Amino acid sequence: MYEAARVTDPIDHTSALAGFLVGAVLGIALIAAVAFATFTCGFGVALLAGMMAGIGAQALLSIGESIGKMFSSQSGNIITGSPDVYVNSLSAAYATLSGVACSKHNPIPLVAQGSTNIFINGRPAARKDDKITCGATIGDGSHDTFFHGGTQTYLPVDDEVPPWLRTATDWAFTLAGLVGGLGGLLKASGGLSRAVLPCAAKFIGGYVLGEAFGRYVAGPAINKAIGGLFGNPIDVTTGRKILLAESETDYVIPSPLPVAIKRFYSSGIDYAGTLGRGWVLPWEIRLHARDGRLWYTDAQGRESGFPMLRAGQAAFSEADQRYLTRTPDGRYILHDLGERYYDFGQYDPESGRIAWVRRVEDQAGQWYQFERDSRGRVTEILTCGGLRAVLDYETVFGRLGTVTLVHEDERRLAVTYGYDENGQLASVTDANGAVVRQFAYTNGLMTSHMNALGFTSSYVWSKIEGEPRVVETHTSEGENWTFEYDVAGRQTRVRHADGRTAHWRFDAQSQIVEYTDLDGAFYRIKYDAVGMPVMLMLPGDRTVMFEYDDAGRIIAETDPLGRTTRTRYDGNSLRPVEVVGPDGGAWRVEYDQQGRVVSNQDSLGRENRYEYPKALTALPSAHFDALGGRKTLEWNSLGKLVGYTDCSGKTTRTSFDAFGRICSRENALGQRITYDVRPTGEPRRVTYPDGSSETFEYDAAGTLVRYIGLGGRVQELLRNARGQLIEAVDPAGRRVQYRYDVEGRLRELQQDHARYTFTYSAGGRLLTETRPDGILRRFEYGEAGELLGLDIVGAPDPHATGNRSVRTIRFERDRMGVLKVQRTPTEVTRYQHDKGDRLVKVERVPTPSGIALGIVPDAVEFEYDKGGRLVAEHGSNGSVIYTLDELDNVVSLGLPHDQTLQMLRYGSGHVHQIRFGDQVVADFERDDLHREVSRTQGRLTQRSGYDPLGRKVWQSAGIDPEMLGRGSGQLWRNYGYDGAGDLIETSDSLRGSTRFSYDPAGRLISRANPLDRKFEEFAWDAAGNLLDDAQRKSRGYVEGNRLLMWQDLRFEYDPFGNLATKRRGANQTQRFTYDGQDRLITVHTQDVRGVVETRFAYDPLGRRIAKTDTAFDLRGMKLRAETKRFVWEGLRLVQEVRETGVSSYVYSPDAPYSPVARADTVMAEALAATVIDSAKRAARIFHFHTDPVGAPQEVTDEAGEVAWAGQYAAWGKVEATNRGVTAARTDQPLRFAGQYADDSTGLHYNTFRFYDPDVGRFINQDPIGLNGGANVYHYAPNPVGWVDPWGLAGSYALGPYQISAPQLPAYNGQTVGTFYYVNDAGGLESKVFSSGGPTPYPNYANAGHVEGQSALFMRDNGISEGLVFHNNPEGTCGFCVNMTETLLPENAKMTVVPPEGAIPVKRGATGETKVFTGNSNSPKSPTKGGC
């Protein structure tokens, strides 16, 4: 403020006047709302409430004015100054005499303020921020000359808000209270008229009620049961054909406040807009006067009546949650609780004309406006981002023909509209030139619409009770429905040709009050006086209650268990300031005067803060996490994130073209990815820093049909008219085929000789699944659609004549559908949850059949802090205690036997040191992308190097860090990749060179190591079964994906697909026994030396907690017995306990299943039994040297000596140890990621299954079925690039650029998903989220599911695009469909891919790929971020 002012320096006028008007609008609305609510309570109460509101309104005036004063624009310059005193060669300015040229005022205003103790030519020196007599301020000054002293006003300064306006507005506040009360009186007699029909989209995602209902009701059921929409869709209450604008979006003009060009259609609209009769565009909302009222026509063509308003008055529609205000200068402004302001300009209701919307703004001042011709048609759309759209009209009917984006001299066609001979919209052509929609009409009524792929929905009309109504619909796929209307009885029935019937009842306002679904499920809805649902009675004896405030906002929501969540809001908005859950946990948020989040707190009091630039924007410039870490964000004029700097000062930059399409992304190392995109934004080619690229081809609907990956590998996808996948062809030409019924439900999936078939209930739920080996799975559901039973009918035995084996599993759930009891033939498992639905205890009790198998009772308990974070888990082998920092990072892990692991972190959680007790395990160094480049390993140091694609290309360990590099050091390993990104060669200091080759689909076909003189060859059948020879002779040894023969091995299976017998030549036989959940219980191994019986025990979550080996000689004499016990950290083995000692495992902080070290300690009992010196009492630490997928290759001790080294066969069997070094000095059972080798069985325990390294596949079927892939025994295409740590579904692990569609595990009701995003390295990185368990966002009600957590992760980390693969066979639930777009940052995009063959069965599940985009009304993240 002390910068010296000079001639030519700018003067600025603030937006105080504009801000004052916003404050006035808010204040009038506030008083009017209070008066509405209190008028009937008596004049005294109304007066008191009005006085209180007046206090608030006057405060709003001040807030509005201060909002405006935050922002300024240049309005002129200083034009006169000192004749002989210069600053930076410019005349110095001084008060009382220096004049300015102001564009807003005449004659020449003077500088009014100046320094109290520095004078120029006897006059006070002027500085930056000193006032001008017209109310402006000096906007800039010298960068190196400063005039200090206080500030004194020497001349009068005009107020930027005129006194007359202050007086008028004060009067308006008083009048607003009176008129508000009258409005409340008039409301009962029709003074304020509700729309004749309810909002057609009121209950879908993105709308408050849709979001609330989506927590309890499936998305399709919300539309049908509550919204009254059926089919594609039809409004069953009126028989009108509608098309929701949410599914008819043609283009979004990028801007800080984006402009969506989307169409709404209703056959009930007689008005012919610029697209023809029945169609409405967003800019066709309007006001007009009729019958003594002001009628507002919204974007669905619905009319709502407001009373006539005088200047300074406002009215509020509770049903539609909108305010209409007439400002003192005669302008009409409509605004909603979403804080969008619609300016209709100055309007005289007596004129008879229409007042069209002319400008739209949000609370932050971001805007777009419409320029119109003399006919009221929009000719241009201007945006605050600088892009404009030009609208051209065809000449025959004057309809809208094209919308073209314009930036300076560059033009881009966004959408083209075509018309039939009657001027009705007939086609929509997108920016790519593809015809994406076609329509046909008869007598002005829509009779069909077709998508880009030819899927057609057709309609038959009949006049009933004087109105045209749809009486029949059919599709090009053969689906057919008929509609029966009882207008007088207010009910409608819809029938299918097979006899299924749905039935609705509705009230006089066309609100659904009862609905019976196709499967008999019954719904009932009760409403309050303004049409807001207050009670929702659902199938399964479930009731949901809602309470509202006077603005129609949900303030209390009580679920079917009687648990209530309460919400408070900020002002007259939908912004929550406090959400208190049923468990008492509270989330709070604070906003600034523009409605932007400035801070939030969770139940633990952890605070996140946001900073914003001094500009009209809702986009934050900085985010401070709960530890004070600062991340900065830079945005371009279109609202695109162009710079993200983490709290370590590392920056990622993204560039966009003038039309908002991504061009490139550059990481902190300067590595750049470039994008060639289609006009609609999808990538055509992505080129990586090394010059390699991927290309994408799309059909007319914009869905991917051909993908050419790295190395030129081609995948092709064939789709039906619905866009559903009907054939997938991999790069090797193998095909997976899909067949659907007329309603789009998957009926058959075939991969070569392997075939799955499916049947469904009347309500569309999956009833049966038949697998390739003949196993039949039958599903049973409750009234609420929850799964209650599963019958598994074993595969038919061609040699047996009796009935097939049947296994029955039963589920008991509470009224929220949460699993409480699971009953299997061998055990009963009970689940306990707290009020936040967090799992607190799982208890197992064996049945008599289970006791016979040796299963014993067991329990696991969990503890959480006030923030809902998991802090402890207790099991039969001890407790694991988590100490978390403010960002939810584990900083200490307490283990049984008094052991502790500590992680020292920097930034938002990057680990730089790991300690075991007082001993340092490893110190880490990282590069600018936070990747590990160095770690200590006792006396050794290991360094790593990466290629431009982020893949590890070398690692080297040795005593002298300075001597480490590619091919040097004590232990070194180099990696080579082919053009497709597959690992083709490893060379290391112990094993020499090992080469790998692959088929075109990336499946391993050979492995060769000249040093070992071993060459392995493999082949694959079309169903993904690994065969043991390249000539495919063993093809006949696979039936129904069950492997029967492999070299000298022979396999037999039980009826449920579990390996029952394995024979190795004539000398070894193994027999396997399983429990009621197909978990391996015993292995009986007999060979020429005798018998080994191996028995396994599991906790109630299915984690192996004990293994006992008992050896017998050939006479049956017991030789020895050994038991090992296991402790788990979540789903990761953390401790192995033997009679004499404990081994604790430490994993990489960057690769969760790649071991870093093992700490071996002697048990206390052994210490007490023998004399051991103090040096041996400390842990003995061994260090792992792993390959890129985390498989241990060597183990060294603290002195740097090799204690173990393994020689692997292709599929993970260690055939020799310590080649080229001394004898092994320690056992090392870890193998591929998540695997533990059992010497007694030859199998690898793989968390939820056992893996057989002899044949490279699992011994039983995937617990998650098709979610893990079409072949339920399959491990991975190749074991050197893929991992499957849970034994459920493989995922690609070599580099950040290729991604698979891994399907992750569901257990105990959890949905697990992997979120992929572009990291600071410019590559794809992954993060696993799960529902039903610990989450990084435990205190945000909308982040319980994978999609919500991914969306918040995107927001908190400045990520503009992400991809989610999840395991839920029910697809994306209605809650996530409804909420994710609200959670996403503005303009961000997230694609959610369900498991293969996902089928909706409950809670809004949708088994299709969903694309979510963020909107500008979404609340800012209430959670932490990461660097």
UniProtKB/Swiss-Prot annotation:
Record bears the keyword ATP-binding: no
Record key words, sorted: Hydrolase, Membrane, Metal-binding, Repeat, Toxin, Transmembrane, Transmembrane helix, Zinc
Gene Ontology CC terms, in alphabetical order: membrane
Family in the record: Belongs to the RHS/WapA nuclease family.
Membrane topology: Multi-pass membrane protein
Practical application: The deaminase domain can be used to edit DNA. Is particularly useful for editing organellar DNA, as unlike CRISPR, it does not require guide RNA. Splitting the domain yields 2 halves that are not active until reassembled on target DNA by programmable DNA-binding proteins. Can be split at residue 1333 or 1397; each of the halves is then fused to a mitochondrial target signal, a TALE array specific for the targeted DNA, the half DddA toxin domain and a single UGI protein (uracil glycolase inhibitor), leading to editing without significant generation of insertions or deletions.
Binding-site residues for Zn(2+), renumbered to this chain: H1345, C1373, C1376
Main location: membrane
Primary role: Toxic component of a toxin-immunity protein module, which functions as a cellular contact-dependent growth inhibition (CDI) system. CDI modules allow bacteria to communicate with and inhibit the growth of closely related neighboring bacteria in a contact-dependent fashion. Bacteria that have this module inhibit or kill bacteria without it, giving them a growth advantage. Probably specifically inhibited by cognate immunity protein DddI. The C-terminal 163 residue fragment has double-stranded DNA cytidine deaminase activity; it does not deaminate ssDNA, ssRNA or dsRNA.
Protein name (Swiss-Prot/TrEMBL): Double-stranded DNA deaminase toxin A
Subunit structure: The toxic domain forms a 1:1 complex with the DddI immunity protein.
Record field: transmembrane: 16-36, 43-63
Upper taxonomic lineage: Bacteria, Pseudomonadati, Pseudomonadota, Betaproteobacteria, Burkholderiales
Observed effect of gene inactivation: A double dddA-dddI deletion has a 100-fold growth disadvantage compared to wild-type in competition experiments.
Domain of life of the source: Bacteria
Free-text domain note: The toxic domain is at the C-terminus (residues 1264-1427); expression of this domain in E.coli reduces viability nearly 1000-fold.
EC assignment: 3.5.4.-
Region: C-terminal effector domain, has cytidine deaminase activity, residue numbers: 1264-1427
